[in-house]
Amino acid sequence: MSTTSREDAVYLAKLAEQAERYEGMVENMKSVASTDQELTVEERNLLSVAYKNVIGARRASWRIVSSIEQKEESKGNTAQVELIKEYRQKIEQELDTICQDILTVLEKHLIPNAASAESKVFYYKMKGDYYRYLAEFAVGEKRQHSADQSLEGYKAASEIATAELAPTHPIRLGLALNFSVFYYEILNSPDRACYLAKQAFDEAISELDSLSEESYKDSTLIMQLLRDNLTLWTSDAEYSAAAAGGNTEGAQENAPSNAPEGEAEPKADA
C-alpha cells in the first residue's frame, strides 16, 4: 500500500465510522493493518473500534437469541427451538468468521511488527479478547482450544504490561478488566477474577496522583468498571451462598451487558 492509499484507507475508515458502516471500516483498517508496518495509535484504535462494533452487535444478538431458545425449551416448544437453534448457529458462524479474521491479522502482521510495549500489550490483549469471544459460544475441544489461546494472549500481554506500563495506563487497566472477565466468565474462577480486578484497582489507586491529564478520563472509567465488576461478583457470590443454603434455583443469572470496550463491558470488559 502506498503512503497515499494508506492515508485514503484511514480516511475512509473514519468516514465509515461516522456513517456507522462498521463492515466497511473493518475492510479499510484491515488493509492498513496488513502492510507489515507498525500502526499509529490512531490507526490502532480505529482497527479496534471497527472490529469491536462488528463483533459486539453479533455478541448481543447471540445472547438475545440464546435466551429466547432457553425460554422456548423450558416451554417444550420443540419446533420453535429447532428454528431458533438454526438461527443461533448462523450468528455463531458470523462470530467465528469475524474472530478468525482479526486473529489472522494479529498473528501474521500486528504482533510480529509491534515495536513498542504499548502496541504489544494492545495486540496480545486483542488476541485474548477475540479468542474469549470464540470461547463464549464454542463447545467441547473448540471451546478448550479457544480458552487456552485466550489465556495465552492475556498472559503475554500481562507480562509486558506489568514490566513496561504504569498501573494507571488505560491499556494496562483495560487488560486487567478483560482478563478478570475471562477468569469469571470462561474459566468460572470468581476468586481469581476478583483478585486480579482488585489488584489492578488498588495498584492504580496508589498511583492516581501520577496520572496524566490526557489519560485521566479513560483510566478512571476503567477503574470504575473494575470496581463495578467487583461489586457485582461479590454480590453474586453472596447470593449463590444464600441460594445454596435456601435451595433456590437460578442463582447465577447475571448475563454480561454490553458497554464500550478498551473502552469496556459490565460484567464489563474493556
UniProtKB/Swiss-Prot annotation:
Keywords: Cell cycle, Cytoplasm, DNA damage, Meiosis, Phosphoprotein. GO terms for biological process: cellular response to heat; meiotic cell cycle; mitotic cytokinesis checkpoint signaling; mitotic DNA replication checkpoint signaling; mitotic G2 DNA damage checkpoint signaling; negative regulation of induction of conjugation with cellular fusion; protein localization; signal transduction. It is found in: Cytoplasm. It comes from the Eukaryota. GO terms for molecular function: protein sequestering activity. GO terms for cellular component: cell division site; cytoplasm; cytosol; mitotic actomyosin contractile ring, distal actin filament layer; mitotic spindle; mitotic spindle midzone; mitotic spindle pole body; nucleus. Acts in cell cycle and stress checkpoint signaling by sequestering signal transducers regulated by the checkpoints. Required for the DNA damage checkpoint that ensures that DNA damage is repaired before mitosis is attempted. During environmental stress, sequesters srk1-phosphorylated cdc25 in the cytoplasm to delay the G2/M transition. Sequesters byr2 in the cytoplasm to prevent its translocation to the plasma membrane. Sequesters ran1/pat1-phosphorylated mei2 from its non-coding RNA activators (including meiRNA), to prevent meiotic induction in vegetative cells and to regulate meiosis I. This is Checkpoint signal transducer rad24.
